[in-house]
């Protein structure tokens, strides 16, 4: 259902857009951090999410969430909600079978398929516009959103273009917050991203190279370099692992499904097999030296390669070594931190697998599959502990591991200091965004001949006007709701 607001004048409204389906714990950390910071800066802020899986993300973050896309593509799959939430009426099995056959036949006809896509897109655009009329700021909320690897040009690049155009038409401001640029290959992707970036009144990028790539798309994409939103995750404790002399060592290893033919959009099975062999060789060697190893993942595709890696590691191992090897699945960021706090050192490949390790006070070696991981390690002063996934050898990894173990205390202290600095920068960015939202709301009141009710705002949540749910297929219900807005220019000093 959509949420219709009657006479909402007492709180700003911000919509957080992300290609997040509730499974990737790095994206989950980003959204949790941003939500907490926005509420800290503006206690009366009303938030909603625009995601690939509204029901799941709404349940996880306790805000209402709406469908990001009308259609699904390979490696970019959205979900739709039922219009009324009712169960379908019982139908005879024969009728169900006939219905399914007719649907398959219809989808096989190009014209019918294109017509359905057009109708779905039109209806989704109308509902999205209705939502955005009640939003002050559409925030493109962190992560590697300038990218066409997952879903192609008609995946997220198109979604960004569509939502930013609709936001401006609805009178909302658009802000890109600490976004990253990854693979940008096709001309169509560049056109979609050029439109989206040009319509924003605030832009920040999580690293200098992302900013450079964005400026290569359009000179109007200028913005600040502001760290990844995950660095401001509240509730994290950067507590160094304290080991007594001779105590057993525990290591967390987070493999990645990079190149896997069935799990990664750009398949390179030969590279994937080579990666698993080298990683297995490293894990096998440290197990033989008495180290305990825990396999973990921060994204659903990666845990699907645990069995393959375990099989390779266990070849030639004695029973004692096998007993020190285990795998743990994490469904939430909190569970992931439990895993990280139980180990002393980490070997990971995903950006947020590495970043969250440092946030938990655990030094990490990165086996980098992408520029963003290499950039993160360099910014944290850990470039010597970063290996290229395409060329690393198990012996190289073993040498870096021993060096990391020897210098772990120094690394923990240095990285903790940098993380605190990043947290302060991110808090300033959130204050800027809430000020932008407040300006949009006040300008809307003045334009409509209304006055801003400070007394009502100070009365707190119980003094807010009521919110009426109305039917519509876009959203998963939760306790928060969205707001109204328009455009307002603002700047942010370069870090």
Residue ranges and their predicted role:
Residues 1-458, 463, 468, 472-476, ...:
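Active-site anion-handling motifs in enzyme catalytic cores
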Residues 479, 484-486:
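Intrinsic disorder/low-complexity segments
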């Amino acid at each position: 259902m959509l949420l219709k607001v009657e006479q909402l004048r007492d709180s700003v409204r911000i919509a957080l857009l992300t290609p997040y389906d509730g499974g990737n714990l790095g994206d989950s950390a980003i959204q949790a951090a941003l939500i907490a910071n926005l509420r800290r800066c503006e206690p009366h802020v009303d938030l909603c999410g625009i995601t690939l899986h509204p029901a799941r993300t709404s349940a996880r973050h306790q805000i209402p969430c709406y469908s990001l896309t009308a259609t699904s593509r390979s490696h970019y799959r959205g979900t739709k909600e039922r219009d009324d939430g009712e169960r379908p009426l019982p139908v005879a099995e024969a009728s169900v079978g006939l219905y399914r056959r007719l649907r398959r036949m219809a989808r096989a006809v190009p014209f019918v398929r294109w017509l359905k896509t057009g109708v779905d897109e039109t209806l989704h655009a109308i509902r999205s516009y209705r939502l955005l009329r009640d939003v002050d700021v559409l925030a493109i909320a962190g992560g590697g959103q300038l990218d066409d690897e997952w879903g192609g040009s008609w995946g997220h690049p198109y979604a960004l273009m569509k939502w930013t155009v609709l936001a401006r038409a609805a009178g909302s401001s658009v802000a890109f917050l600490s976004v990253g640029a990854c693979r940008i290959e096709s001309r169509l992707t560049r056109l979609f991203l050029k439109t989206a970036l040009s319509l924003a009144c605030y832009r920040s990028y999580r690293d200098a190279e992302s900013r450079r790539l964005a400026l290569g798309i359009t000179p109007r994409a200028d913005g600040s370099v502001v760290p990844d939103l995950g660095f401001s995750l509240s509730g994290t404790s950067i507590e160094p692992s304290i080991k007594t002399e001779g105590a057993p060592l525990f290591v967390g290893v987070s493999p990645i499904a990079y190149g896997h033919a069935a799990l990664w959009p750009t398949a390179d099975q030969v590279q994937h097999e080579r990666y698993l062999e080298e990683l297995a060789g490293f894990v096998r060697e440290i197990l033989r030296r008495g180290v305990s190893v825990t396999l973990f993942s921060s994204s659903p595709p990666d845990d699907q390669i645990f069995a393959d890696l375990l099989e390779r590691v266990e070849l030639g191992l004695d029973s004692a070594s096998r007993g020190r090897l285990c795998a743990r699945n994490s469904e939430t960021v909190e569970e992931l931190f439990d895993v990280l706090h139980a180990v002393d050192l980490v070997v990971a490949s995903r950006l947020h697998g590495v970043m969250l390790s440092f946030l938990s006070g655990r030094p990490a070696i990165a086996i980098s599959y992408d520029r963003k991981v290499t950039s993160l390690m360099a910014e944290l002063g850990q470039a010597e502990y970063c290996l290229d996934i395409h060329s690393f050898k198990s012996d190289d990894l073993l040498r870096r591991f021993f060096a990391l173990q020897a210098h772990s205390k120094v690394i923990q202290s240095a990285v903790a200091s940098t993380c605190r600095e990043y947290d302060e920068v991110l808090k300033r960015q959130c204050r800027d965004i809430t000020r932008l939202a407040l300006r949009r709301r006040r300008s809307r009141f003045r334009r409509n001949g209304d006055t801003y009710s400070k007394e009502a705002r100070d009365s707190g949540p119980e003094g807010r006007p009521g919110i009426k749910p109305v039917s519509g297929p876009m959203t998963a219900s939760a306790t928060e709701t969205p707001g109204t807005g328009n455009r307002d220019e603002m700047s942010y000093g370069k870090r």
